[in-house]
Amino acid sequence: MAIGLKEKYKTTVTQSLKDEFQYKNVHEVPRFTKITINRGLGEASQNAKALESSIQELTLITGQKPIVTKAKKSIAGFKIREEVPIGIVVHLRKDKMYSFLEKLINLTLPRIRDFRGISPRSFDGKGNYNLGLREQLIFPEIDYDNIDQIRGLDISIVTTAKTDQEGLALLKKLGMPFRES
């Protein structure tokens, strides 16, 4: 599964981007560095089961066990204390990254209700793309009967692109379904 997207990048996308942006060297062509999947869990401080179920879901989705993020300092307004779990994060690189990206493009995004494409405006100015999903049910690994609550997650696709236009071209050529705006 991961071989398809990685091979497509190496064979067709690299040469296409090199011609489009007039790069002198193949190593100048933008590539993927990592994909970060993050889920904030505000209720994890009161509900340990929410943390465990989220860890299990993200492990199923990514194939890698997430890291538990903890609060750096206490904030009374948010009712959190220092070192209390407040979220989970997974960093995907190399083959797992390409496998997840292929699954996201071909299986997951088309399962979103009334899906017309993702926004091309979610770039950060340096060629990295951020995507927020409202529910985990769109992933094929998640069974509807086994979830306790619908939770969203954030996906950051980090590239070596210098500008948003380069990042957009890279993702479009790999088949990311962007909305026409």
Swiss-Prot record:
<keyword id="KW-0687">Ribonucleoprotein</keyword>
<dbReference type="GO" id="GO:0003735">
    <property type="term" value="F:structural constituent of ribosome"/>
</dbReference>
<comment type="subunit">
    <text>Part of the 50S ribosomal subunit; contacts the 5S rRNA.</text>
</comment>
<dbReference type="InterPro" id="IPR002132">
    <property type="entry name" value="Ribosomal_uL5"/>
</dbReference>
<dbReference type="InterPro" id="IPR020929">
    <property type="entry name" value="Ribosomal_uL5_CS"/>
</dbReference>
<dbReference type="Pfam" id="PF00673">
    <property type="entry name" value="Ribosomal_L5_C"/>
</dbReference>
<dbReference type="InterPro" id="IPR020930">
    <property type="entry name" value="Ribosomal_uL5_bac-type"/>
</dbReference>
<keyword id="KW-0934">Plastid</keyword>
<keyword id="KW-0699">rRNA-binding</keyword>
<dbReference type="GO" id="GO:0005840">
    <property type="term" value="C:ribosome"/>
</dbReference>
<keyword id="KW-0150">Chloroplast</keyword>
<dbReference type="InterPro" id="IPR031310">
    <property type="entry name" value="Ribosomal_uL5_N"/>
</dbReference>
<dbReference type="GO" id="GO:0006412">
    <property type="term" value="P:translation"/>
</dbReference>
<protein>
    <recommendedName>
        <fullName>Large ribosomal subunit protein uL5c</fullName>
    </recommendedName>
</protein>
<dbReference type="InterPro" id="IPR031309">
    <property type="entry name" value="Ribosomal_uL5_C"/>
</dbReference>
<dbReference type="InterPro" id="IPR022803">
    <property type="entry name" value="Ribosomal_uL5_dom_sf"/>
</dbReference>
<keyword id="KW-0694">RNA-binding</keyword>
<dbReference type="Pfam" id="PF00281">
    <property type="entry name" value="Ribosomal_L5"/>
</dbReference>
<dbReference type="GO" id="GO:0019843">
    <property type="term" value="F:rRNA binding"/>
</dbReference>
<comment type="function">
    <text>Binds 5S rRNA, forms part of the central protuberance of the 50S subunit.</text>
</comment>
<dbReference type="GO" id="GO:0009507">
    <property type="term" value="C:chloroplast"/>
</dbReference>
<keyword id="KW-0689">Ribosomal protein</keyword>
<dbReference type="GO" id="GO:1990904">
    <property type="term" value="C:ribonucleoprotein complex"/>
</dbReference>
<comment type="similarity">
    <text>Belongs to the universal ribosomal protein uL5 family.</text>
</comment>
